[in-house]
Amino acid sequence: MATTPAPRLLLIDNYDSFTYNLVQAFLVLGAEVLVRRNDEIDVAGALALAPTHLCISPGPGTPRDAGVSMRMIEAFAGRVPVFGVCLGQQALVEVCGGRVVRNSRLMHGKTSLVEHDGRGGYAGLWSPLEVGRYHSLVAE
């Protein structure tokens, strides 16, 4: 019986201490994780790695300060699933034509209930699910 190969995830590290928390989570899920800093790889080098998934990490500054992050999203969008966390999510918003602006209501250390259908990333989780929020920006 043939087995499905492990996802080959390229994680662009935007110099953030949270990056290796993401690496650990993806490893637990069975992915092969390739980490490259945002100034140590170009799009051609990333394509040569043949990832099946792309993740853009958190980091300081704005998406325009994040090295190759936005170029990676442009190159891989539509080819492989692309996931962004914090700064990575902001980069996704900007590449897709949106804007990231300050929220009129800060959500630092606040909790909220999320109701979901139990599919995808929510599989096996309670609904409603109490989640922690820590953000001061929103996408328009």
Regions flagged by a language model, labelled:
Residues M1-G78:
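N-terminal beta1-alpha1 cap of cysteine-dependent amidohydrolase-like domains
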Residues I12, V85, Y134:
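Single, functionally critical "micro-switch" positions that shape active/binding sites
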Residues S17, Q90, Y134-S136:
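Hydrophobic alpha-helical segments, especially transmembrane helices
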Residues Y20-N21, A44, Q90, E94, ...:
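Alpha-helical elements of the RecA-like P-loop NTPase motor core of helicases
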Residues R37, R102, R133:
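Short loop/edge segments at beta-strand edges and connector loops
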Residues E40-A44, H108-G109, A139:
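A short acidic, often aromatic-flanked loop/helix-cap motif at beta-alpha or helix-coil junctions
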Residues P51-G124, P128-E130:
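Cysteine-nucleophile active-site neighborhood
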Residues W126-E140:
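Active-site oxyanion/phosphate-handling segment shared across diverse enzymes
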